């Protein structure tokens, strides 16, 4: 399960390019940027001369997208799990070895082909020979090997390092056969190609001498990234905008240069302001408007709304270390005493669906019947609490256990997130009806995450939060007992059968053989109830009517960015 923060968990920028919002990029005094950016300019000049703009109305012009969050750590692939940043790494500035088609099946991208040996222990990629870094240097197998070595090196601190658990780390795990061939070694496991869909390849010739622990602070990520993808980096103004230029030399076999001459990503922290900018025409694509803004976009002249089932799900995670929450019956009672369908309808306004586990509706193992889902049933919730030894012993309406501990819980949510505030407030009202006292508490996101993720702290009962799931669902980092002292294992779940099922699912290659195991996993997870799952969101996009080539699905908001175009009439 990939933990992606956009727009869920903001991470502090550690290599800012300007001290104030919108300040010009500071590259003049940075030796790395001073060296590489002139080479990028020369590459662009030569590429434009060799590949002039085609005489087609779709080519040229500027398109502006906007959303509320920065691209945390920018193009430094190995130091961020930010959703917006990884989308730009995959689809805008850099390239992955493979991507997914509309049916979520692997297809060639930087790698033109691959094969795996019979026992699934060696995977060989064959790279395209026509992909250049934006300084004119060819992309080779050495870049792939370098990126892999850094991704599997614990000194790097790669947030998605668990994705590579079943690969052989370090130099023993990768071999450069020639400039266009690289072999990696692995242990047989499910969906072994999926990590290569998300890991954009970095330039070894620019970063190979940088110590793994220094990559986070390196200017490459935020000041002067040199990619090899369809768009060339031009400028970053901190907390304001990123500007990219279409790459004239992007391979014809991959569609050639993008239609757009200039692509701009803007940061507009206030969603009301962002909506007004879309309606006024100063923004072409508003990424992830709130559901309560959808109707305004639909009703306004010149704009349209696009929606698709997506991968983020919202939940309240429970700290099972607390005496009030240690018994799974209490956690099940909490979920059954909460009308999650009412919550989803009130918040999503029809743009989403109730969640019951980490398996998203687009996942191949998703059960459309949701056989193990807990229904809204306050009577059964009361019975479970009685059975667990929690009764109202003093008549004040709040249950206690035999030691006199009140069934009182505090739910944290992050400042500025109205949806999670509403969830906590609705739970406060509904759980009171079964004898549970709830106190919502708002915190700044960084402070909240410090409490929840730090094994030395974890002074909390429940937390309203969200994850963006990946196509390869592996909940080991969330619920495996071995991860209870790791940042994402904050629930402290200890269930031997759940551990066994997660270990088994990770290595079953055949999907049909895995289906019954997934079913049992969902059943046990429902009984354990480490999270009260609320809903999967649809991704919404507000778009100007005259923007062409736009499509949206669970792969991401920028999956079709190479095909976006604007008419000549407004250039």
Region roles according to the model:
Residues 19-20, 151, 157-160, 174, ...:
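Extracellular/periplasmic solute-recognition and catalytic clefts
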Residues 58, 126, 162-210:
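Surface-exposed binding/hinge segments that line
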Residues 91, 101-105, 199-258, 262, ...:
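Gly/Pro-rich hinge or "lid" segments in bacterial periplasmic/extracellular proteins
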